[in-house]
Amino acid sequence: MNEYIKGLPKAELHLHIEGTLEPEMMIDIGKRNGVPLPYPDAEAAREAYAFKDLQSFLDIYYQAASVLLCEQDFYDLTMAYLKKARSQNVRHAEIFFDPQTHTSRGIAFDTVITGINNALRDGEQNLGITSKLIMCILRHLSQDEGLKTLEQALEYKGVIAGIGLDSSELGNPPDKFRSLYERAHKEGFLTVAHAGEEGHADYIWQALNTLHVARIDHGVHCMEDETLIHTLVERQIPLTVCPLSNVRLGVFSSMEEHNLKKMLDRELSVTVNSDDPAYFGGYVNENYLAVQQALTLERKDLVRLAVNSFTASFLTQEKKQQHIAAIHTFDKNIT
């Protein structure tokens, strides 16, 4: 199945660009920028990429991001991801970035977004991978701070397609950001939110009913609530699931325990994504392979996941259908 997964056309919809910072790149950029790091080399840094839950992961994640200072850094980070994604036959990526992680360190908003966007444009031109950029608000910070960041984003409406919500979930429910999302909708942004990773089904309800999001990031705890399952299916709300991340952060004790297959069986619009691949041990194809092996997924399941990835995207209907046709052509030509 490895070669089949590698060749399968797919989209990635849950990817934090800061989470693609491989130890080697972190060390290189740190040296380039004169940022002292507590690791003598990439191998030591990789060993330090150890954590037991979401919060301990975030602590390491924010420390690593401290090397990102210049437009070139954000360009290099983004281009490295796009090249990796293209090698795994990702045709379209909807990428999260966390400006508050950088502006809180004195990095200009424009520096962050210009570096990322230049790479996205070059990626489309040179690699043929299309993309959309989603700005995430850090939920452990206040709504007022998030609103200030949203104000900064208004100047870049042509670049930023959507608004999301990430970081520490427990104790920071979606309801906390009601006003921010009202403003985002008013300004014409697409909206998504992380919900139901650490938080339970109620957080998903809040994201749907208070924030009125078009897509739920993670959402695995939806299976606790029958009414919620029916609502998600009826309203065709996609769920961007990240299997390796879920196991690494202890949401599930093992991949065999993951509920992805059960979600598929309930006709939920589930997609497979890598989240923060530099930290969780794999990019999108490794996630596909992990669930395929652990949950004994068949080819028809993999096709469904790939089709879902485009159906759940923010591409036009015409573009979605073109990609879905390519999936079926690929599948038909594989014996």
Swiss-Prot record:
UniProt-annotated catalytic positions: 197
Disulfide bonds: none
Pfam assignment, any one: A_deaminase
Domain of life where this protein originates: Bacteria
MF GO annotations: adenine deaminase activity; zinc ion binding
Gene Ontology CC entries for this record: cytosol
Catalysed conversion reaction: adenine + H2O + H(+) = hypoxanthine + NH4(+)
This protein's record includes keyword Hydrolase: yes
Details of cofactor binding: Binds 1 zinc ion per subunit.
Cofactor: Zn(2+)
Enzyme Commission code(s) on record: 3.5.4.2
Enzyme class: hydrolase
CDD domains for this protein: ADA
Keywords for this protein: Hydrolase, Metal-binding, Nucleotide metabolism, Zinc
GO biological process, one term: adenine catabolic process
Binding site for Zn(2+): 14, 16, 194, 275
Binding site for substrate: 276
Positions marked as site (Important for catalytic activity): 218
Purpose: Catalyzes the hydrolytic deamination of adenine to hypoxanthine. Plays an important role in the purine salvage pathway and in nitrogen catabolism.
Similarity remark: Belongs to the metallo-dependent hydrolases superfamily. Adenosine and AMP deaminases family. Adenine deaminase type 2 subfamily.
Protein name in the entry: Adenine deaminase
Organism for this UniProt entry: Chlorobium phaeobacteroides (strain BS1)
Lineage: Bacteria, Pseudomonadati, Chlorobiota, Chlorobiia, Chlorobiales
